[in-house]
Amino acid sequence: MLIHQSAKCENTTPKWAGKWHLNDQDTVFGGAMEVFNCDDTTCDFKLESWYDLHICDVEGKIKISADKAEYNGKKYQYDRETDTEYFIPVGILFQMESEYKMNLHFINADSFSAFCGIQATLEGIWIRQ
């Protein structure tokens, strides 16, 4: 009975969950991400990527739809000339390419500056470890 139950648990493990790495072979450019607390429609994630001393640092909840997921947020902006505060929509698209390969892209141009330092990026192929 225990063997059957443990096999059942293994089959229900979400395909998104795990530890992922961007360019694992390079210490100047790379990244690490953990995806956890997954259910059928969402997962939590923490991500850090870097290029030299510039970093991207993002954490939140992705919404899953088949082999794609999105993280959506808002970037605070302040216009000094008009003394106006406002928010710009930003986000990241996660696309599962295989069981061990995920492609990340910014949803729009404003997303880069919301999450990353001058030369860092989180875009690219992430490999499950």
Feature locations, PLM:
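Tryptophan-anchored aromatic micro-motifs
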Residues: T12-G30, Y71-G73, L122-Q129
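An anionic, turn-rich surface loop/hairpin at beta-sheet edges
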Residues: Y71-G91, F112-A114
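N-terminal glycine/threonine-rich, aromatic-flanked beta-hairpin/loop signature
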Residues: D26-A66, N103-A120
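Bacterial Sec-dependent N-terminal signal peptides
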Residues: M1-T12
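Short, hydrophobic/aromatic-rich segments at coil-to-beta transitions
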Residues: T13-H21, D39-K46, I64-E81
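Residue-level detector of beta-strand structural context in well-folded domains
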Residues: G18, M33-E34, G60, I92, ...
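Short cationic/low-complexity microdomains
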Residues: F87-I107
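A short, hydrophobic secondary-structure junction motif
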Residues: K68, M96-N103, G124-Q129
